[in-house]
Regions:
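Conserved beta/loop motifs at nucleotide-recognition and modification sites
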Residues: 36, 40, 47-49
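Residue-level hotspots within the lipid-embedded alpha helices of multi-pass solute transporters
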Residues: 14-15, 80
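Short, glycine- and charge-enriched coil/turn segments that flank and shape catalytic ligand pockets
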Residues: 34-36, 100-101
Length: 144
């Protein structure tokens, strides 16, 4: 298996420095042709949602259209994305420097994400929990 420094750095990032996770990921990648090895494949295997999907989710929430939100949530789930991953990655995005948002909105969104995570832990239905999350986000974000 041919691995370059870019792939090694990506593995280190997604495994968060956990050697066992890195080894498991390498074992999984070894079963895949090295010609296909790229960062997108690693993200897919690790269940990482592409950033453009998260940003689009937030943009759809800004439109404050309930029918569109239902379609967005259904498409998100049909694409196989994890609501837990959405909550984690959205929290990271909101707290990053790349997110141009007032601090007050960021705090409200983080609180909503925390509530959503609790609902998931308590066994909430992913579709309903995700739709609830989208509706609450749309209440916080200003309309386009």
């Amino acid at each position: 298996m041919n691995i370059n420094n870019q792939i090694i750095n990506k593995i280190q990032k997604v495994s968060q420095g956990d050697l066992r996770k890195s080894i498991n990921l390498l074992q999984t990648l070894s079963k895949i042709s090295s010609d296909l090895l790229n960062e997108e494949l690693i993200d897919e295997i690790c269940g990482i949602i592409p950033m453009q999907v998260i940003v689009q989710f937030l943009e759809d929430c800004r439109e404050k259209d309930t029918k569109k939100l239902k379609k967005t949530v259904n498409a998100f789930i049909e694409d196989g994305y994890s609501i837990k991953a959405l909550v984690n990655q959205m929290g990271n995005y909101i707290m990053s420097e790349g997110c141009n948002m007032e601090e007050e909105r960021k705090i409200k969104l983080i609180y909503v994400l925390r509530e959503t995570e609790i609902k998931l832990i308590q066994g909430g239905t992913p579709n309903i929990v995700c739709l609830d999350l989208a509706c609450k986000i749309s209440e916080i974000l200003p309309k386009k």
